[in-house]
């Protein structure tokens, strides 16, 4: 099933509303996506604004040309995202996020705060971390 150009502002979504669905050019605003198991999902050209994204499990999950702004990402194993994987983060808090072995060339991480995040063997060539802070 595909959802195109929709603004989603419902505060609490159910896991079944998101799994098995492809989203294109949608805006997710003030959404809480905590403890979800995303299976067979694709988000392309979507924007996530002021969202809480914690402790996700990702299976057959794609993220293509998406933007995260003013979001909290915590306990996410981004290494489970399928290729291609392209996104930008602006003014986001990232805690315990695993980027190990991802190819994130030319990714944008502007004014983000990284706490206890893993980047081992991650390809970050030409990525922009302007204004970002790192703490372990």
Regions found by a protein language model. Name each.
Residues 1-136:
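Tandem repeat scaffolds
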């Amino acid at each position: 099933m595909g959802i195109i150009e929709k603004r989603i502002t419902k505060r609490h979504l159910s896991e079944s509303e998101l799994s098995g669905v492809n989203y294109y050019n949608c805006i997710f605003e003030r959404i809480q996506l905590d403890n979800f198991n995303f299976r067979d999902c694709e988000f392309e050209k979507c924007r996530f604004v002021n969202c809480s994204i914690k402790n996700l499990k990702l299976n057959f999950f794609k993220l293509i040309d998406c933007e995260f702004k003013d979001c909290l990402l915590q306990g996410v194993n981004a290494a489970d995202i399928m290729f291609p994987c392209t996104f930008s983060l602006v003014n986001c808090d990232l805690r315990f996020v695993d980027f190990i072995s991802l190819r994130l060339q030319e990714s944008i991480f502007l004014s983000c705060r990284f706490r206890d995040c893993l980047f081992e063997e991650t390809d970050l060539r030409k990525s922009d971390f302007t204004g970002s802070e790192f703490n372990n």
